[in-house]
């Protein structure tokens, strides 16, 4: 019986140490702050949000010092995800102001973060609801066209400021929208020809 207790204690201790170790290894990338760098520039470089970068480094202000080492949180947004987002932004927000492009990219990220939608960029963009794709450019093939540089920049900005918007999960053009359901959503902001809603 004593042997069983010792084995149980050793096993529990080993598991707790292993669990702690895997938790601390979750964010192992670091960045040495250079003169003139900001949270936004660093977050943009690594494809993480400013909020997450500040949170993991216990920072509440925007103050950074050259030579300071920051821990970079892991991100689930790959380069392929960014490219896919940029192509969707380019197709959905063609002719819209830059702020509208950022807002479209933010809707994608908000959906990824919402329990009501798929939890990946690809899953959100290619989601089908009642037999229809959620985004028209997926349905009509415009998603396959290359993204313009402004749309790529808009995606980077949306990633850097992830979680700081108004929580929009939808957007639509009221002149072309045919769904009464979308028109019933609470509008958070209007940018260009698009209304963004929850």
Predicted feature residues:
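Sec-dependent N-terminal signal peptides of Gram-positive bacterial secreted proteins and lipoproteins
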Residues: 1-26
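Core subunits and conserved enzymes of cellular information-processing
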Residues: 2, 40-43, 113, 193
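Intrinsically disordered, low-complexity Ser/Thr-rich linker and spacer segments
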Residues: 15-17, 26-30, 69-83
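Primarily a LysM-type cell-wall glycan-binding module
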Residues: 21-47
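Conserved hydrophobic/aromatic packing and binding residues within compact polymer-binding modules
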Residues: 39, 53-54
